């Protein structure tokens, strides 16, 4: 009937409008108002990248255009996602009479807020009463550790004199500017051993290819978390220098630099422990020490690719100490993940001429399949493919993959990606699933026809 076809047409138009609005709201520097964001979020809470939309919505808030009570209500029980949002929420609390809570939020938000040149001037003036020198120093430290050199440069002039000299040196080291030596010489004595300054000096030397003088810094500093401030940042430099020292056959120093990392958790900790174990086993012939490092690595990872790596290298370490039963147990552990490199190496250790099979992919309930393919975002994906705009389906497909994992949404999202010839997105969806030990091998390792030239 005419009315049902016009109703269908209206639904279709609304779906297209939603998608265009979503893309618009995700574009930085757009002209949308906070209310545009609010309307979209109220109607489309099931869209992809909603956290990012909320983050950008916070940057549209202002107590001049939205009442403080409305701002407080909008955040509700949720913490702001941005430093900017924290400041505006803090200002709203002050305006309704809660000065303590408001000031605390402004101070916290100021440290991490993403501010343009004009916004920095504006908020610096606006929050003059609530911010002190300490807040400026904290912001400078945050920006410096994150390598935000342009934002740091804008802030330096507002710092107390001794800190201005310290952060000017850090800024020049970061930006490889002229006058680095003089800037370092100008740093007050009390900051000569500042962790951030040493980190930026190390990075500067390493980028210039100065392995020996980089090593000098790493051997001289204290290696505890308290001193290093961001041991995870230091790790990247340690790893590069440590490998460079292996090429120079300086194995003991290489081990010392990789193992004195000052971390106790996180992905960088796991990387440091694996590398230290590998150096101990392969270059220092010390399987006992290697074992401890590999155990630390194994106990701090969860992805199959890393679990198989840890188990395989534990197998190697126990093999070296002659504990064959323990060695084989660890190899067996690694073979639980046969789609990984180390899982396959471990399988060959136990079955030198053996063949292995992968598990079958999961079956999908036909009812759920129909429900899935009727979703608005699925239809949008097909439309984008027809319009040759399939690059925009990436986040949509990843979002759809989480719809109902138990019923097979990951498989169906990968199938959808394959049907619009985005094998790369199908692989992404399957790879993310594999991190949680769910293997969809048909889509993770697609068989494609040979390209014709």
Report each predicted region and the residues it spans.
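Residue at a conserved register position within TPR or TPR-like alpha-solenoid repeats
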Residues: 28, 61, 93, 143, ...
């Amino acid at each position: 009937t005419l009315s049902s076809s016009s109703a269908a047409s209206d639904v279709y138009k609304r779906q297209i409008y939603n998608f265009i609005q979503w893309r618009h709201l995700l574009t930085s520097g757009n002209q949308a108002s906070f209310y545009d964001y609010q309307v979209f979020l109220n109607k489309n809470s099931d869209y992809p990248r909603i956290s990012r939309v909320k983050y950008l919505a916070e940057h549209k808030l202002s107590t001049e255009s939205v009442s403080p009570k409305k701002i407080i209500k909008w955040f509700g029980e949720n913490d702001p996602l941005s430093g900017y949002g924290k400041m505006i929420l803090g200002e709203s609390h002050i305006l309704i009479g809660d000065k303590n809570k408001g000031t605390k939020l402004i101070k916290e938000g100021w440290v991490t807020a993403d501010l343009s040149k004009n916004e920095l001037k504006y908020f610096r003036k606006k929050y003059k009463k609530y911010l002190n020198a300490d807040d400026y120093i904290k912001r400078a430290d945050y920006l410096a550790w994150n390598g935000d050199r342009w934002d740091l440069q804008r802030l330096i002039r507002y710092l107390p004199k001794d800190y201005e000299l310290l952060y000017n040196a850090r800024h020049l080291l970061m930006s490889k500017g002229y006058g680095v030596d003089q800037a370092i010489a100008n740093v007050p004595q009390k900051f000569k051993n500042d962790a951030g300054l040493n980190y930026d000096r190390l990075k500067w030397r390493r980028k210039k290819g100065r392995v020996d003088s980089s090593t000098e810094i790493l051997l001289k500093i204290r290696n505890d978390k308290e001193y290093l401030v961001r041991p995870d940042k230091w790790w990247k430099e340690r790893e590069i220098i440590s490998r460079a020292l292996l090429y120079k056959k300086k194995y003991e120093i290489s081990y010392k630099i990789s193992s004195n990392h000052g971390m106790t958790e996180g992905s960088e900790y796991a990387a440091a422990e694996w590398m230290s174990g590998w150096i101990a086993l392969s270059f220092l012939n010390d399987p006992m020490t290697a074992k401890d490092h590999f155990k630390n690595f194994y106990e701090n990872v969860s992805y199959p690719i890393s679990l198989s790596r840890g188990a395989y290298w534990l197998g190697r370490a126990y093999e070296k100490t002659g504990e064959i039963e323990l060695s084989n147990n660890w190899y067996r552990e690694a073979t639980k993940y046969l789609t990984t490199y180390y899982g396959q190496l471990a399988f060959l250790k136990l079955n030198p001429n053996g063949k292995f099979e992968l598990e079958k992919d999961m079956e999908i309930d036909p009812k759920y399949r129909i429900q899935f393919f009727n979703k608005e975002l699925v239809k949008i994906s097909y439309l984008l493919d027809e319009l040759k705009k399939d690059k925009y389906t990436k986040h949509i497909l990843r979002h759809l993959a989480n719809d109902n994992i138990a019923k097979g949404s990951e498989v169906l999202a990968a199938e959808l990606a394959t049907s619009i010839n985005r094998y790369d997105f199908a692989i992404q969806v399957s790879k993310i699933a594999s991190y949680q030990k769910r293997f969809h091998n048909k889509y993770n390792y697609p068989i494609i026809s040979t390209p014709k030239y």
